[in-house]
Amino acid sequence: MRATAAVLLAGGLLGLVAPPAATPSSLTVFRIDHVADGDTVDLMSGAKIRLVQIDTPEVYFSPECYGRQASNLTKRLLPPGTLVRLTREPATDAVDRYGRLLRYVVRVEDGLNVNVQLVRVGAAAPYFYDGRRGRYAHLLERLTRRARARHLGLWGACPGTPYDPDRGVATGALRP
């Protein structure tokens, strides 16, 4: 009887300290289900991930200049089945107002940080919600300056796009 009670008690305590199964960590590998848009992906586990600290032009609802191209690039970088690791940015919230996990997405095969790569090629701009700059803030800002100077991606396709990392990217209405 005592042994049974001890096992039940230990099992109950383990449940209190074990991490929740739905909380992705950078040590766990996940598989991409599909790309929803340029800065949002869905995992086969059912989790929705918003790429943290970046913003891409909108594709749906109010389509913006370069939105489709940014989304297509993310789809090429993260085709269905791609193995990724997710890293939380301590400077930001863990989840956005839509219930998406805010994470850096890193491909397992080559270590490519997709958030950084999208900014590097001009498909995204830094977005520091509430002014909270994370671990890659300086790198993202430097890559944006370079992409703008070289007219890469949205910076070449959408002339006059303002750059304000505290407000996100707004390329304006999609031009025909």
Language-model regions, residue ranges each:
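Small beta-barrel nucleic-acid-binding modules, primarily SNase/OB-fold domains
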Residues: 2-8, 13-176
